[in-house]
Amino acid sequence: MSAPIIAIDAMGGDFGPHCVVPASIAFLAENSSSQLILVGQPALLEELLSRYPSLDRQRLRVHAASEVIGSDERPSQALRGKPDASMRVALELVRDGRAHACVSAGNTGALMALSRHLLKTLPGIDRPAMVTAVPTEKGHCHLLDLGANVDCSAEHLYQFAVMGAVAAEALGCVSPRVALLNVGTEEIKGNQQVKLAASLLQKAQGLNFSGYIEGDGLYRGEADVVVCDGFVGNILLKASEGLAAMVSARIEQRFRDGLAAKLVGALALPLLRRLRGDIAPARYNGASFLGLQGIVVKSHGSAAEEGFQSALRRAALEVRENLPQRLHGRLEHLLL
């Protein structure tokens, strides 16, 4: 694969270009071979870019789009009502081969609907799934689906497991252990769809299926790929992010309570900073839409500069690893 070219929906998210522009500049500084296309309102983008006079504009250019998809707009409105929206135009650049990937912090439902409409799914895939990395005791695991598919059949869960395993392999995990998230590890536990999915996965050739996993096992690193429907996955992800933020805040507050605590806190500061970095949601920001004929990464809408950089890094890595092509090559051997 040539140098990654990433199209960015510069108007999406809570902070829009005021986050996207500095994050893009920082990303280019650490990725000398990548190129970025900022899609959005040229006047605003050029004004923000003018604050970086030493920027190599051959590696970052602006592509005009006059409309923005709001966070409260329905996917159907995004599909029909705004042909020049920054999100849509960025995806069209990928569809037309002018960019290798799209990154957006905008409306998740609209991004999924437009991605399916413009990029299409890979052969054999019914629905794309959202996947991201979550921290564990042993490093991280890949969790999917994160909300794209609230109701899933057993076949959908099977497809998610296959896609998650192939993606984990592409990103460096050897023979990833695949598990279904469940209310227990015994075979009798779980609803009918989870049980049927487990039966399908047990028969799959070339897939390292390890059975069921509970929520605490996920964080102990008992699996490399954890599969669930989007309803459960989204709640789990948001709860995890909230817990990480609460723990960080509580630790910081405790080390402010009294002189002795402040002294201990000063000594422990390097360790605490490392711990905070290990579990910080910004480090793991960026959910990939697996199963499309193109690379799309969704950044958290509230992500600041560091988090958006993480989403850009994930997109660039998937471009370098030719993830859609690798998925296509493996899926035909693993899908039912």
From Swiss-Prot:
SUPFAM superfamilies in alphabetical order: Isocitrate/Isopropylmalate dehydrogenase-like (SSF53659)
A UniProt-annotated Pfam family: FA_synthesis
Main location: cytoplasm
UniProt keyword Transferase, yes or no: yes
InterPro entries to which the protein is assigned, alphabetical: FA_synthesis (IPR003664), Phospholipid_synth_PlsX-like (IPR012281)
Enzyme Commission number, as recorded: 2.3.1.274
UniProt-annotated location(s): Cytoplasm
Keywords of this entry: Cytoplasm, Lipid biosynthesis, Lipid metabolism, Phospholipid biosynthesis, Phospholipid metabolism, Transferase
Intrachain S-S bonds: none
Annotated Gene Ontology cellular component terms: cytoplasm
GO MF, one example: phosphate:acyl-[acyl carrier protein] acyltransferase activity
Entry-linked Gene3D superfamilies: Isopropylmalate Dehydrogenase (3.40.718.10)
Substrates-to-products reaction catalysed: a fatty acyl-[ACP] + phosphate = an acyl phosphate + holo-[ACP]
Pathway annotation from the record: Lipid metabolism; phospholipid metabolism
GO biological process, one term: phospholipid biosynthetic process
PANTHER family, sorted: FATTY ACID/PHOSPHOLIPID SYNTHESIS PROTEIN PLSX, PHOSPHATE ACYLTRANSFERASE
General function of this protein: Catalyzes the reversible formation of acyl-phosphate (acyl-PO(4)) from acyl-[acyl-carrier-protein] (acyl-ACP). This enzyme utilizes acyl-ACP as fatty acyl donor, but not acyl-CoA.
Family: Belongs to the PlsX family.
Subunit structure: Homodimer. Probably interacts with PlsY.
Designated name of the protein: Phosphate acyltransferase
Lineage, broadest ranks: Bacteria, Pseudomonadati, Pseudomonadota, Gammaproteobacteria, Pseudomonadales
